[in-house]
């Protein structure tokens, strides 16, 4: 959908649409995940004569595609969209030759650390170690729910995707729902990644995604309510300051 300047939707309608779009995205993720699972249902993968090396790609590629889609549909770069080869070449040249402040390196380092953690903890091989408090949370979820949902889905991805949709419907600045969408893609990519575990039954992967979607949707609604409350409080204090002046 192209960027437009239409009036923002109401808060309740925006929240309902945020929940609806999260469910739709989760359904697409489940379809893609089951397709991958069907491809892996082969003796050579179970006997480990062949290894599936696309686990980390299922996590990284959606983020790259979202960045490209945003650059094509929203005026993110210098107030313009990038829809042709010439515009893409101009973007690359401008991006590589732009002035960079020192604080940008700290931001890049922080983002690089986050990417290292998320990508390193995906896949079948040992990567970034899991902290103790998260192991306790996992144990609690395993004992409480039918299938333990993934933390990056219901804590980060799904709530962020709902807030991104809410931000878009409410006509917040584009950069806000862009960053939130990048965070939201983590949850959707994680759902696809769940089906890449060879020895996990498909039904368990479906239930794991469903449990994560259920809790993530609840957290997303609570996050939207919390953000709305903070905005009302901020506006109230600003109005009081204006009255005192």
Question: Regions from the language model: what does each represent?
Answer:
Residues 1-245:
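Alpha-helical transmembrane segments of integral membrane proteins
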């Amino acid at each position: 959908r192209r960027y437009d300047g239409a009036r923002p939707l109401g808060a309740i309608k925006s929240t309902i649409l945020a929940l609806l779009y999260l469910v739709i995205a989760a359904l697409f993720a489940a379809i893609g995940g089951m397709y991958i699972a069907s491809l892996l249902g082969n003796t050579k993968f179970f006997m480990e004569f062949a290894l599936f090396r696309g686990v980390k790609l299922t996590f990284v590629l959606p983020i790259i595609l979202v960045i490209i889609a945003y650059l094509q549909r929203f005026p993110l770069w210098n107030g313009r969209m990038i829809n042709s080869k010439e515009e893409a070449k101009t973007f690359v040249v401008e991006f590589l030759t732009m002035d960079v402040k020192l604080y940008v390196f700290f931001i890049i380092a922080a983002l690089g650390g986050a990417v290292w953690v998320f990508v390193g903890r995906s896949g079948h091989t040992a990567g970034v170690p899991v902290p103790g408090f998260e192991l306790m949370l996992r144990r609690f979820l395993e004992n409480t729910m039918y299938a333990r949902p993934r933390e990056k889905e219901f804590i980060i991805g799904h709530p962020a995707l709902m807030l991104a949709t809410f931000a878009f419907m409410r006509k917040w600045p584009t950069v806000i729902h862009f960053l939130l969408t990048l965070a939201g893609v983590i949850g959707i990519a994680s759902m696809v990644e769940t089906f890449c575990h060879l020895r996990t039954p498909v039904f368990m992967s479906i239930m794991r995604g469903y449990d994560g979607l259920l809790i993530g949707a609840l957290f997303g609604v609570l996050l939207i309510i919390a953000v709305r409350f903070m905005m009302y409080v901020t506006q109230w204090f600003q109005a009081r300051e204006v009255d005192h002046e």
